[in-house]
Amino acid sequence: MINVTFLAHSGFLVDDGKRCYVFDYYKDPNNIVWQLAKRGRELWFFVSHVHADHFNPSITEFDGPQTRYICHQDVPLEGKVKKCITMRPGHDATLDDVSIHMYGSTDEGGSFYVKTNTANIDSDSIFHAGDLNWWHWLGDTPENNADAKRMAWREFKELDGLSVDVAMFPVDNRLEDAMEWGAIEFLRRVEVKKVFIPMHLNGPLWTPSVYFKALFGDVPVWEPQKEGDECTF
């Protein structure tokens, strides 16, 4: 069983009962992470890249014996906290009983695949996309959008055959009619067993299109309605 709490924007807290994985902490208006820190919970912060809506330097305030930081190599945290590792796309890390792989991005940084217990084949796996997406902007030039598609296909190809329990992926309103394109291509390649969670909305809540539902009607989707919402899977 795994509990997921939406912090804000692309920020999530995933609690597997043993430790709490905090992805792309940007803000936490409900002070959920602080409450867990005060209770002595083990906190692992994952930072996909340096954009201000994915990385808040204040996460150093959580540093302590129960805290780890796993960051893309461009995130300036090394030397500022006690336990920090940096990664780049294509690299693996094993910390305690947790295995981590950093996949690529179509913007800055990378994306994270986390297996929560390497000793248990049935343990939960988590994918957080960071800014990995098909960034097709309707007002952009054909050349730029062709480049965006090539970049997306290159990174999505690395995900072919991946199976995850929980996936968090951008569905950005600013892309207008193209807002689902990245999610659709992601789900064509990746099996999501427990839940697909849209993030990075930059606008109203997402209503899956008829086309999306026709393709992936069997994929469980949870869309948080507000900051602080949580669900157990």
Model-derived regions: residue spans:
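Metallo-beta-lactamase
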Residues: 67-123, 218-233
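Binuclear metal-ion centers of metallo-dependent hydrolases, dominated by the metallo-beta-lactamase
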Residues: 4-10, 80-95, 158, 179-233
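Pre-active-site segment of Zn-dependent metallo-hydrolases
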Residues: 11-50, 57-61, 132-161
